[in-house]
């Protein structure tokens, strides 16, 4: 892809009151106890030994001190070193899938934890005890993360799991199973802004650089988990399958009650009105931000430094308009139209407030948006 014209207003998004934190916590001294190292590309896969991987969960704080902020490539996709490994991703690709498994799949910063909270409540019929007693990352482990990949066999049924994997790296067994995937999409402009903020406090991620630099990398897919465009275009091919639900952050933000009903229907777990209202109330942004089991405040600063910005920032739609410059908006729109042409429209395409200064109306809707193209796997 040719370089993007992002230099008209160089190096600034408008982030009121933002102060850039130090890039990374200093490395531990030589006297620190050595920590287990994930295998690197080219090393033979080691036997699945749960005892070997227990230290990752028991010593999160110590391990987080060794995060380098560097990435490795696995089949062309970037992953942060230390949180993921080639072996953990390979485990997911070849993992067994149970018919009652429930997967939440998203591109990063698309509302994953919101969906985890909702499903945690639905699976408990609206009872908030689980979300108030168990950390969110244990309720729905990340499949491809080192800790998640090796803990999946021990998860009780029905297993609730989360993933940012593009479709080509997802568990192959899923495509011949009755397991369910809920894919949550979000306006990529808001995703980019949220990911920029997150990259400032998440120690496993590279420093994002200037907003111009980060946006250029985002549009080229040179960020963790690769291209947003490739991610959503890959998974949207599942639309129309009985075990696949596509829903957007914007739909849920506009009408959470109806969205929860739709999710319950997809899961075959109808709720009474009282339980439904409990799900809606306890999964609100305000409730999640106040819940220590859901706001990631239990993580050490060396892993997620919320002294420089909250993990749960705003929970709104359209925040990109407070940050994008005119040049950035125009550059984004050009790439978006090129990448998304021919796909069905999304809620963010038809929002008049999201219209950019560019005169092109955006991607053309497909003749039949509800028709699912060919399956991604034989």
Where would I find each of the regions flagged by the language model?
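C-terminal anion-handling pockets and recognition modules
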Residues: 277-288, 325, 329
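A generic structural motif
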Residues: 132-134, 274-281
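Conserved C-terminal subdomain of P-loop nucleotide-binding cores
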Residues: 189, 228, 234, 240, ...
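Hydrophobic alpha-helical segments
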Residues: 266, 282, 338-342
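PAPS/PAP-binding and catalytic site of the sulfotransferase fold
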Residues: 113-125, 247-271, 279, 287, ...
